[in-house]
C-alpha cells in the first residue's frame, strides 16, 4: 500500500491465559482508504480493534496514530488525537433528537461537556446539520432517535463519529442488523466520506459483499494471525482464505465475486 499512513500497527500481541488473540499483527491504514479485517468468530478482530481504540493494552507491540504513539493510552486521549468509532450495535441517546446527538458530540470536541438531559438548543446546531446533511439525515434532525429505523440510526451514529473530526475511523461490523440494500448504501456513504475528507477507515465485517465491494485492502485474521493481506481479488483467490471459509463462508466469497 502507498500513501499517507494514518495508523501503523506494529507487531501487536495479546494473550488471555493460554489463548493467543493477536500474534505479531502488523498493518497500516492510509488516508482516504478503507481497510477490512475479516475472519471467523474468535479470530481476534475485536481484540485488535480494542487495542487500537485503547480499551485493551497490548502485551507487546506498538500503535501509532498520525505520528503519535497511542499504545496503551485511554480511549478519550486517543479520541482527542483523532480516532472515531462506530459500534456493532449503534450507540445513540434514543431520547434525544437526531440533531442533539450530533450537537453533544460537537460540544465535547470544543470542551463544553453537558449533561445528556439538558437541552442543547442552538449549540453547534449548524455544524450538526451540515454533518446530518452529508449522511442523508438532515430532514430527520428534530426527530427523537427512538423513532428511527435501525438503518437510519446507523447513519446518525456515523454523523456522531464524524463530529469529532477524526483522522481515522474504526467501524465495528457497520452493516450488522441492516437489510442488504441498506448495507450497500451505508458502505458507499462511508467510502465516499473517507475519500472526500481523507479519513482512513478500518472496519470489521461478516458481509462479504460489503467487504469485497468497498474495501481497498483486506486482511484475513485466523487465531490472532494475519494469514493473507492484499487487494480483494488476490485475497479472495488465496487458497488459505478459501480453506478458512469452506462451506457457507466459501459460498459467500464466490457470491461476492459475481
Language-model segments: which ranges?
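Glycine-rich phosphate-binding loops of nucleotide-dependent enzymes
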Residues: 2-258
Amino acid at each position: 500500500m502507498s500513501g499517507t499512513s494514518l495508523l501503523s500497527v506494529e507487531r501487536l500481541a495479546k494473550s488471555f491465559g493460554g489463548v493467543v488473540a493477536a500474534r505479531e499483527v502488523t498493518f497500516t491504514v492510509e488516508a482516504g482508504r478503507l481497510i477490512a479485517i475479516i475472519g471467523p468468530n474468535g479470530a481476534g478482530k475485536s481484540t485488535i480493534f480494542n487495542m487500537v481504540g485503547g480499551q485493551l493494552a497490548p502485551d507487546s507491540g506498538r500503535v501509532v496514530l498520525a505520528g503519535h504513539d497511542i499504545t496503551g493510552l485511554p480511549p478519550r486521549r486517543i479520541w482527542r488525537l483523532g480516532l472515531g468509532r462506530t459500534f456493532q450495535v449503534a450507540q445513540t441517546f434514543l431520547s434525544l433528537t437526531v440533531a442533539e446527538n450530533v450537537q453533544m458530540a460537537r460540544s465535547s470536541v470544543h470542551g463544553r461537556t453537558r449533561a445528556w438531559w439538558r437541552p442543547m438548543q442552538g449549540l453547534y446546531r449548524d455544524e450538526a446539520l451540515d454533518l446530518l446533511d452529508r449522511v442523508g439525515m438532515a430532514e430527520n434532525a428534530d426527530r427523537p432517535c427512538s423513532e428511527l429505523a435501525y438503518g437510519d440510526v446507523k447513519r446518525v451514529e456515523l454523523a456522531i463519529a464524524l463530529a469529532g473530526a477524526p483522522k481515522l475511523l474504526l467501524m465495528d461490523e457497520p452493516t450488522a442488523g441492516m437489510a442488504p440494500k441498506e448495507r450497500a448504501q451505508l458502505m458507499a456513504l462511508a467510502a465516499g466520506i473517507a475519500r472526500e475528507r481523507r479519513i482512513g477507515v478500518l472496519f470489521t465485517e461478516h458481509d462479504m459483499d460489503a467487504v469485497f465491494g468497498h474495501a481497498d485492502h483486506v486482511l484475513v485474521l485466523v487465531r490472532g494471525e494475519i494469514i493473507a493481506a492484499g487487494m480483494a481479488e488476490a485475497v479472495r483467490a488465496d487458497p488459505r482464505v478459501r480453506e478458512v471459509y469452506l462451506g457457507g463462508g466459501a459460498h459467500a466469497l464466490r457470491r461476492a465475486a459475481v
